[in-house]
């Protein structure tokens, strides 16, 4: 059984998590932990959060029975949790709204964020515009090339987008730069981390804000079928959309849970982002978790067709869930994700994000091994508008 009280008071999920940061950040993290502990059960805070999720984000979003996709596959019934229908087009806004309300109560005037696919950057710039914060978003220069439309959206919303040209010029490097900024501007700045990684209390806090996904999906599936689903599937980069779906089901032992990492060009090629499958425990971005590193402990460059999964670490709770065996982690490669992207688009008229397409691809494989009476909930974590240029380029089309 999974203990619901994790993390412990030090932010540990078993041997993972914690607060591995420079002394200059410890006070800021303790201040944040104190504020979150104070407000997480505060009725005024929760009431305001609920109102914003309902009226601004558009929750609850539907649990959609993908009848045509299910029929074409010929196995289990596939249900899509439609996070792509949220305002800004992905699950990220669930968390940025929560952290923005916390920043407001803490008296901060400036918010910063890191972003890979650009969705978290857009969600942060969106809440900054709504609540009147100054906003700076750090983004790898490689990702800026891949996600030009999201970069423009952030700028339109009033954010300053800072290109990061160090390292692999992707998400891990953007996170490093954001942490450096926070060290220098701790007094007036709130760092809105977009995933369940980072130092305590971020993995817990982001999980709690994203758990609305699983809470809704659980109730919706019960309402539609009168029972719990047989399986859950979600993609895992840092892991926030996945833990958001998984967390409310962890104690339901009848429900199989699968996290899907980016297999890139194949695990055997070394060009992938599958930290849990091919990595080993180490410390990255303030927490102990599984990460992709060489024999000297240096973080490796990663690859995925989807910018949002292109990260060499993973949230510490996922590391714990892997070790305990409660969640099974799989890898889907670029070509399999692209096939699923096209199949869902053609059968259901829903264009998924490339990140979400990894989950859809594994759900298709899994469904074929199950009966028509069984069901799978897939977290459709975002929409594919941002990926049009990437997919078109792969197809040899210029848009």
From Swiss-Prot:
The record's annotation in Gene3D superfamilies points to:
3.40.50.1100
Q: Where does the record place the modification N6-(pyridoxal phosphate)lysine?
A: 92
- Keyword Nucleotide-binding appears in the UniProt entry: no
Required cofactors, per record? pyridoxal 5'-phosphate
Q: Which SUPFAM superfamilies match?
A: Tryptophan synthase beta subunit-like PLP-dependent enzymes (SSF53686)
Coiled-coil region(s): none
Stated family: Belongs to the TrpB family.
Query: What NCBIfam families would the database entry show?
Result: trpB
The name of this protein is: Tryptophan synthase beta chain
What organism is recorded for this protein?
Answer: Legionella pneumophila (strain Lens)
Q: Which gene encodes it?
A: trpB
